[in-house]
A protein has these predicted regions:
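Solvent-exposed alpha-helices and their adjacent loops that cap or buttress functional pockets
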Residues: 1-4, 105-108, 114, 143-149, ...
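Short glycine/serine/threonine-rich phosphate/pyrophosphate-binding segments
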Residues: 19-20, 94-99, 129-133
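Short acidic, glycine-rich surface-loop motifs adjacent to enzyme active sites
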Residues: 83-95, 240-248
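Short Gly/Thr/Asp-enriched flexible loops that form oxyanion-binding sites at enzyme active sites
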Residues: 88-111
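Internal gly/pro-rich beta-alpha loop/helix module
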Residues: 115-190
Length: 248
């Protein structure tokens, strides 16, 4: 009996990982992900098949917004029955926000959605893009008893797999750009890929994937600190149509 070979959909939204250097001009240009397997032959060693899809216009992650989250969720919903896992390539600046958003948008998720990116472009000599991409795909393709090992939205970066909605970016200069302050990593990549099976979410529901796309942006975040001016509070509470405030 042959084992089931996982099918992974690679979704490119934008970000440094999708750029290569034009050595004639020195400028960065978008990478053609249709040539992915040719540019990264190591992917042939993975026990999975890979297909790619890209946003028509790659997004600078600093410009990420609700409509982009809706598009990501829609792509996953449209392809959910065709693939065993999803890897989302994303700029690092707002990756934690997108991973967190999708973790709440994808109800009854029973397959991996792994966000990853890089600090250096994929064509750079010292790039971290190859390791992040290869291992993110490997994590997404992990299976046990013909079911995905990872069944939630995660973020993989610099040898560590995190729960997506527990991450925060801590560095724009170092390869270990993310951390999860209040929850341990779900897996770590070294000589071996070690998954903490006591921490990963396992879907116990037989319900179909339900995608929530409705957002309300009439919400503010207020960071409290000793001595905060009363006028600041008054101004925020007076914002027209404000429906909620998240206090930090």
């Amino acid at each position: 009996m042959t084992s089931h070979k996982a099918k992974i959909l690679l979704i490119y939204t934008g970000g440094t990982i999708g750029m290569v250097k034009d050595f004639e001009t020195g400028a960065l240009k978008a990478f053609d992900f249709k040539e992915l397997l040719n540019r990264i032959p190591e992917l042939h060693l993975l026990d999975c098949s890979i297909e790619t899809i890209s946003f028509e216009t790659p997004i600078d992650s600093s410009n990420m917004n609700i409509s982009n989250w809706q598009k990501m969720a829609q792509l996953i919903e449209e392809n959910y029955s065709k693939f065993d896992g999803f890897v989302v390539l994303h700029g690092s600046d707002t990756m934690s926000y997108s991973a967190s958003a999708l973790s709440f948008m994808l109800e009854n998720l029973a397959k991996p959605v792994i966000f990853t990116g890089s600090q250096l472009p994929i064509g750079d000599l010292r790039t971290d893009a190859k390791e992040n991409l290869i291992t993110a795909i490997q994590v997404a393709s992990l299976q046990s008893n013909k079911k995905p090992v990872i069944q939630e939205v995660c973020l993989y970066f610099e040898y560590k797999l995190y729960r997506g909605n527990r991450t925060t970016k801590i560095s724009a200069e170092h390869f270990n750009a993310f951390t999860s302050p209040n929850f341990p990593e779900l897996a770590e990549s070294g000589v071996h890929l070690k998954v903490n099976k006591d921490l990963i979410l396992v879907s116990k529901s037989a319900k179909k994937l339900k995608v929530h796309t409705e957002f309300d942006d009439n919400v503010a975040i207020l960071k409290l600190f000793p001595g905060i001016n009363e006028n600041v509070l008054t101004a925020i509470f007076a914002i027209p149509n404000l429906k909620g405030i998240v206090l930090e």
